[in-house]
Every structure is written in structure tokens, then in C-alpha cells.
Design a protein with these regions (language model features):
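Low-complexity, intrinsically disordered terminal/linker segments enriched in charged
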Residues: 26, 153-172
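A short acidic/glycine-rich loop-to-helix N-cap element
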Residues: 35, 132-137, 163-170
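Short, low-complexity N-terminal intrinsically disordered segments enriched in polar/charged residues
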Residues: 17-56, 64
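Exposed beta-sheet edge and beta->alpha loop/turn motif
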Residues: 123-152
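A solvent-exposed, acidic/Ser-Thr-rich amphipathic alpha-helical stretch
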Residues: 58-112, 118
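Sec-dependent N-terminal signal peptides
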Residues: 4-14
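A short, structured loop/turn motif at beta-sheet edges
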Residues: 111-118, 146-153
């Protein structure tokens, strides 16, 4: 009897450890948001150029990359093209030594999705010194640009605005 219980227990243990094949979860979905990443795409190179122009306080030099009817968001605040151009230029009224890559390289790539959209995405650490607070500021940033015909038609910037808002309040 002991041998029978041992045999049944052993079989249950062995078969309970065998993975169950589940085609729904093991199938790779080749859906709309699947696609290919390319860190050497033209859009990646243009985004690098844009980020360099920003850090050099020469953002208007890349104005040609931005669609006239761009939808631009800084967190949940929406801006038009001129709002974006003048807004980022105002950073230099508030901060010195602005950099996108002082402490670490920029992570940047472009995704060509199966639904036909093209997005460049960057993750980086923005740094600067407050002109009013004198604080050394470091902000983690993610931005994504959707491209059509060589122009940015959507732009999303995500970051914690606390240090920026603090510097604005000290400037006033």
C-alpha cells in the first residue's frame, strides 16, 4: 500500500511540474504596435540634431523639422509650434550649463510600427544650474516624436516639472 501511495504521489509530482502548452500566451502577436527599431534611422539622426540644437540654445535652427500644425505636449500641457519653440528657448533664461548628456549618454531610437507610424523616442537625464536658485538640477526625461514626411507631427515630453517650476517662481 505504501508503494502504491508513493507511486501515485511521485506521478502527480512529475506531471504537475510539466509546463502546460498555452498557444494564446506563447504566440507572438505581430500586431499594430509591433515593428522594427532602428537607432540609425533618419528620424533618429534628426532627433539627435534637434537635441544638440536645444542644448546649444539654438532650437529655432531646427524649426524646419516641426510641422506647422504639430501637437506638442509637455506632460499634460499642450502647445502649438511657436509655443514649443519659444518655451524651450526660455529654459536658458532660467538655467545655465544645460545638457542632455552630461551624466550619461542619451538613449535614442526610432520605431517603425506595423500600423505605418514612425516614432523617435529618447530617454535621458537633463541637467542645468538654476540662475536664481543656484541649484544643480537633474531631471529624468522621456520624449517621443511622431514623424510624417520628415516632420514632427506629434511631440510628447514627460518629466517632473518641480525644479523648473521652482526656478520660474524664483525668477518672478
Amino acid at each position: 500500500m505504501k508503494n502504491l501511495i508513493f507511486l501515485i504521489s511521485s506521478l502527480l509530482l512529475v506531471f504537475s511540474c510539466v509546463p502546460v502548452e498555452n498557444n494564446e500566451t506563447s504566440t507572438i502577436n505581430d500586431g499594430q504596435l509591433s515593428g522594427k527599431l532602428n537607432d540609425q534611422a533618419d528620424e533618429t539622426k534628426m532627433t539627435r540634431e534637434l537635441m544638440k540644437a536645444y542644448a546649444e540654445n539654438n532650437f529655432r535652427s531646427i524649426e524646419y523639422m516641426i510641422s506647422d500644425d504639430v501637437e506638442c505636449f509637455f506632460n499634460s500641457d499642450q502647445f502649438d509650434k511657436e509655443g514649443w519653440l519659444s518655451g524651450v528657448s526660455s529654459h536658458f533664461d532660467l538655467f545655465d550649463n544645460i545638457s542632455n548628456n552630461k551624466n550619461q549618454p542619451i538613449n535614442l531610437t526610432t520605431a517603425n510600427y506595423n500600423n505605418g507610424t514612425v516614432w523617435s523616442m529618447a530617454w535621458f537625464e537633463w541637467t542645468g544650474t538654476g540662475k536664481f536658485s543656484k541649484d544643480e538640477v537633474s531631471i529624468l526625461v522621456h520624449h517621443g516624436f511622431r514623424w510624417e514626411d520628415g516632420k514632427i507631427v506629434e511631440a510628447y515630453h514627460f518629466f517632473d516639472p518641480t525644479a523648473l517650476n521652482n526656478e520660474i517662481s524664483l525668477a518672478n
